[in-house]
């Protein structure tokens, strides 16, 4: 995988101490108790950066940011960064200069939380590097990836509960019948004890009572009891008399030969 052209910052710790460590005589791990912990060789700021697959541990001055030492890390855990066996706050890192010279120094943090963040930052970076390498391999050889086998193995069976399936289908096929709507607006009954008001026609209008047109009696304006309605005339009376008279007078005024029938 090609290295990217920009550098990202993974972790910054403002307080770190550097120690000179004695050479390791055996294959056993480093011990911080063998260092002069009360007399650090240098104190400053630690910064972890990443560029592509590589990570860099940089020891810088707190005020000016001048680089004191740098440790390139190509894998973690590895020889570039090692933990001591007797404490979780101290590590041994391998620093390099521009001329290819290398040296091992000890670093320590005053707070265990800072040491934990230092460790996790390196772990997360190289976990990401591993994932990127796997993705690149899968992109080059997509057929070599694991295939999903959904077939039945020899002798493998499955059980289907058809009874429950039929019940569900029956329940879904019989929707609830909604009551038919009567349509229109429902009229409320009149209030109890109410009286139906009698409509009195305006003066000058005629009402058909018992088959004849009568003129309603008008009560005098002075007030008093209402005048009773007159008795209906016999049914033999011609109820269309006034109507035929009015239509006859109208038809007499109509010019003959127009082709229209008057009603």
From Swiss-Prot:
Keywords: Cell membrane, Cytoplasmic vesicle, Endocytosis, Membrane, Phosphoprotein, Protein transport, Repeat, Transport. Residues 166-194, 219-263 are annotated as: Disordered. Residues 246-263 have a biased composition (Low complexity). A motif (WXXF motif 2) lies at residues 260-263. It comes from the Eukaryota. It is found in: Cytoplasmic vesicle, Clathrin-coated vesicle membrane; Cell membrane. A motif (WXXF motif 1) lies at residues 240-243. The modification Phosphoserine is found at residue 181. InterPro entries: NECAP_PHear, PH-like_dom_sf. Its main location: membrane. One of its GO terms (cellular component) is clathrin vesicle coat. GO terms for biological process: endocytosis; protein transport; vesicle-mediated transport. Interacts with AP1G1 and AP2A1 components of the adapter protein complexes AP-1 and AP-2. Interacts with the GAE domain proteins GGA1, GGA2 and GGA3. Belongs to the NECAP family. The WXXF motifs mediate binding of accessory proteins to the ear-domain of AP-1, GGAs and AP-2 through hydrophobic interactions. Selective binding to the GAE domains of AP-1 or to the alpha-ear domain of AP-2 is tuned by the acidic context surrounding the motif and the properties of the second residue of the motif itself. Involved in endocytosis. This is Adaptin ear-binding coat-associated protein 2.
């Amino acid at each position: 995988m090609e290295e990217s052209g920009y550098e990202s910052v993974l972790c910054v710790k403002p307080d770190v101490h550097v120690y000179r460590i004695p050479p390791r005589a055996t294959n056993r791990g480093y011990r911080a108790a063998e260092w002069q912990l009360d007399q650090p060789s240098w104190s400053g700021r630690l910064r972890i950066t990443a560029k592509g697959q590589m990570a860099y541990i940089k020891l810088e001055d707190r005020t000016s940011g001048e680089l004191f030492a740098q440790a390139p890390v190509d894998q973690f855990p590895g020889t570039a960064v090692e933990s001591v066996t007797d404490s979780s706050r101290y590590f041994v890192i391998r620093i390099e200069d521009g001329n290819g010279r290398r040296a091992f120094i000890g670093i320590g943090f005053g707070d265990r939380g800072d040491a934990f963040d230092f460790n996790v930052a390196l772990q997360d970076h190289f976990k990401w590097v591993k994932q990127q390498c796997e993705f690149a391999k899968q992109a080059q050889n997509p057929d070599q990836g694991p295939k999903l086998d959904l077939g039945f193995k020899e002798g493998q069976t499955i059980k289907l509960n058809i009874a429950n399936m039929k019940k569900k289908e029956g329940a879904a096929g019989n929707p609830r019948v909604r009551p038919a709507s009567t349509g229109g607006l429902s009229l409320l009954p009149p209030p109890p004890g109410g009286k139906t008001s009698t409509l009195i026609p305006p003066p000058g209008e005629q009402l058909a009572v018992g088959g004849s047109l009568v003129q309603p009696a008008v009560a005098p304006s002075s007030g008093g009891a209402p005048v009773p309605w007159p008795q209906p005339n016999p049914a033999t009376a011609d109820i269309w008399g006034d109507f035929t008279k009015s239509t006859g007078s109208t038809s007499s005024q109509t010019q003959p030969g127009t082709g229209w029938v008057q009603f």
